[in-house]
Amino acid sequence: MRYLIATAVLVAVVLVGWPAAGAPPSCAGLGGTVQAGQICHVHASGPKYMLDMTFPVDYPDQQALTDYITQNRDGFVNVAQGSPLRDQPYQMDATSEQHSSGQPPQATRSVVLKFFQDLGGAHPSTWYKAFNYNLATSQPITFDTLFVPGTTPLDSIYPIVQRELARQTGFGAAILPSTGLDPAHYQNFAITDDSLIFYFAQGELLPSFVGACQAQVPRSAIPPLAI
């Protein structure tokens, strides 16, 4: 459920004040306003839904970030408008946090979006989408390019994440190696001078009732980064 909107097939919808298909998305084009700190705030509502999103407008790879916001907004509104009216409107909230490391021009920038979505199921869903950028090379940073080649970072990261999540949640069940050593679960992260922060969607590493979670891993305890 948590990835429904990101993978939904989008159908045509006409929304007054929103950009036509193919138009470059922007804060104003999304119906938002730029507030202090170069943060775009988008709020929209109707009889069937409420939508509230905040995200930066000065990220170096802004197109990728705004495209993801737009895709999720459009998918959510299409699903909500095509569903029966209910007592409580469908809800989507998106917030963001930012991190950085180093000093320009040898620096990185991270933006992490957190989505909360209620589509009327038994349990709302929460997930993350992270964007990382190397200002020195003008290239996005992914988990595949994050570490020096020839290293095995998850051998160090996995046990730290397991201990940190157990400490935070009090949930003592072990994360199986088949899950904890799978790079697919570490795609959403932020880079700081001292640590990597990994973000996990609801149900990704721990049972859904635990909720979305994050774990901070000291850079001193893992292989060197390729940045």
From Swiss-Prot:
Could you list the residue ranges that cross the membrane? Answer: 3-23
User: What InterPro entries is this protein classified in?
Assistant: DUF3298 (IPR021729), Esterase_Immunogenic_RsiV (IPR053421), PdaC/RsiV-like_sf (IPR037126)
Q: What keywords is this UniProt entry annotated with?
A: Cell membrane, Cell wall, Hydrolase, Lipid metabolism, Membrane, Secreted, Transmembrane, Transmembrane helix
pH-dependence annotation: Optimum pH is 8.0.
Can you state which reaction this protein catalyses? Answer: a fatty acid ester + H2O = an aliphatic alcohol + a fatty acid + H(+); an acetyl ester + H2O = an aliphatic alcohol + acetate + H(+); a butanoate ester + H2O = an aliphatic alcohol + butanoate + H(+); a hexanoate ester + H2O = an aliphatic alcohol + hexanoate + H(+)
Main location per UniProt?
A: membrane
Q: What is its EC number?
A: 3.1.1.-
One GO MF term? acetylesterase activity
> What is stated on temperature in the biophysicochemical properties of this record?
Optimum temperature is 38 degrees Celsius.
Stretches assigned to coiled coil: none
Protein task: Hydrolyzes ester substrates carbon chain lengths ranging from C2 to C14. In vitro, acetate (C2), butyrate (C4) and caprylate (C6) are hydrolyzed with high efficiency. Has lower activity against laurate (C12), myristate (C14) and caproate (C8), and weak activity against palmitate (C16).
The family classification in the record reads: Belongs to the RsiV family.
Indicate what this protein is called per its UniProt record. Answer: Esterase Rv3036c
Identify the coding gene: TB22.2
